[in-house]
């Protein structure tokens, strides 16, 4: 395992098995170091399973990008667009708090993608939706603060982590899975797709999105051709990771 590998690379430690077997505290420290390194910002990790083949008959491990760390908590966002969903099922003035996509993420997606032990490792996160999270020139309210296990990035968060603005930006471009394309995700050219943010768009019946070229834009909340790129905070101290 990873703890073993750490000690195996240290020249002075020849009897790695004996060291880790007879010193529980040392083994625990080594395991903690390995976990910390695994979840370093910029790394990719796997957690949960979701259909990714065109047929939808598979359950493939979900790959996540580590966006941020807060001590033993890690913010993850899916590497790929995993599904196609509208921001809201009806065309109406709506915020993240009331949209159908939030409900879908925290019910259907959450229960389908994660087993019980994984669900317990995912933190119920306080999600800010005030105007500071949105694009200032649009000046549209994002609604009330919510508590979510699964959420989407806001415009402010996408700007912080990916440098999102109105210009093309390869850092914020993504590919959808074959399953997501089969569900209706729009693909621009070879593979790029646009993906939803939780912030409002130019009007209250729009939602912000990241274009296929990685730029900021907005779309009608009913549009079902956008990719869903979930985000979660996980507790690295939870039993699942021990």
What are the roles of these predicted feature ranges?
Residues 7-23:
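Short solvent-exposed coil/turn linkers within tandem alpha-helical repeat scaffolds
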């Amino acid at each position: 395992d990873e703890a073993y590998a750490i000690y195996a690379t240290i020249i002075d430690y020849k009897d790695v098995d004996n060291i880790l077997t007879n010193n529980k505290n040392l083994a625990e420290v080594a395991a903690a170091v390995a976990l910390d390194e695994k979840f370093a910002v910029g790394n990719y990790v796997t957690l949960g399973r979701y259909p990714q083949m065109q047929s939808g008959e598979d359950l493939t491990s979900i790959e996540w990008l580590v966006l941020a760390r807060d001590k033993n908590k890690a913010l993850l966002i899916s590497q790929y667009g995993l599904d196609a969903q509208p921001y809201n099922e009806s065309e109406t003035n709506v915020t993240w708090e009331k949209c159908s996509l939030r409900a879908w993420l925290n019910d259907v997606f959450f229960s389908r993608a994660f087993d019980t032990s994984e669900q317990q490792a995912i933190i119920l996160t306080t999600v800010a939706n005030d105007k500071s999270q949105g694009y200032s020139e649009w000046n549209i309210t994002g609604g009330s603060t919510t508590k979510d296990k699964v959420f989407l990035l806001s415009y402010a968060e996408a700007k912080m982590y990916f440098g999102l603005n109105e210009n093309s930006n390869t850092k914020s471009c993504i590919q959808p899975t074959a399953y997501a394309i089969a569900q209706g995700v729009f693909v621009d050219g070879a593979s790029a797709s646009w993906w939803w943010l939780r912030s409002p768009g130019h009007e209250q019946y729009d939602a912000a999105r990241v274009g296929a070229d990685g730029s900021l834009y907005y779309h009608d909340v009913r549009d079902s051709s956008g990719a869903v790129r979930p985000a979660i905070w996980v507790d690295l101290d939870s039993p699942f990771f021990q």
